[in-house]
């Protein structure tokens, strides 16, 4: 299982780390690090066949530091995701499930 920060310690609008590798059946937990509103959105074109992008996404904002969201990944492959309000700033991430 892996934890990803929403926002760097420096305040940068990034997922930290932006790329993680896990085994099938493991969980990724995103934690709001900086107090900016962030969410986690998976694009249906950026997930493996058979994975449910909508079910993995957390479109409601995590506003306060320490707020978190977890998702379990059962299907092997590469998952691309982004933060909706900060996508233009390059706030994107990748999860590789083995």
UniProtKB/Swiss-Prot annotation:
Membrane topology: Peripheral membrane protein
Database matches in InterPro entries: BlueCu_1 (IPR000923), BlueCu_1_BS (IPR028871), Copper_blue_Plastocyanin (IPR001235), Cupredoxin (IPR008972), Plastocyanin (IPR002387)
GO cellular component, one term: chloroplast thylakoid membrane
Any single Pfam family the record assigns to this protein: Copper-bind
Location within or outside the cell: Plastid, Chloroplast thylakoid membrane
MF GO annotations: copper ion binding; electron transporter, transferring electrons from cytochrome b6/f complex of photosystem II activity
Listed CDD domains: Plastocyanin
Cofactor(s) the protein needs: Cu(2+)
Domain Plastocyanin-like: 1-98
Family to which this protein belongs: Belongs to the plastocyanin family.
Role noted for this protein: Participates in electron transfer between P700 and the cytochrome b6-f complex in photosystem I.
UniProt cross-references to PANTHER family, sorted A to Z: PLASTOCYANIN MAJOR ISOFORM, CHLOROPLASTIC-RELATED (PTHR34192:SF10)
Name of this protein: Plastocyanin
Record organism: Scenedesmus fuscus (Green alga)
Gene: petE
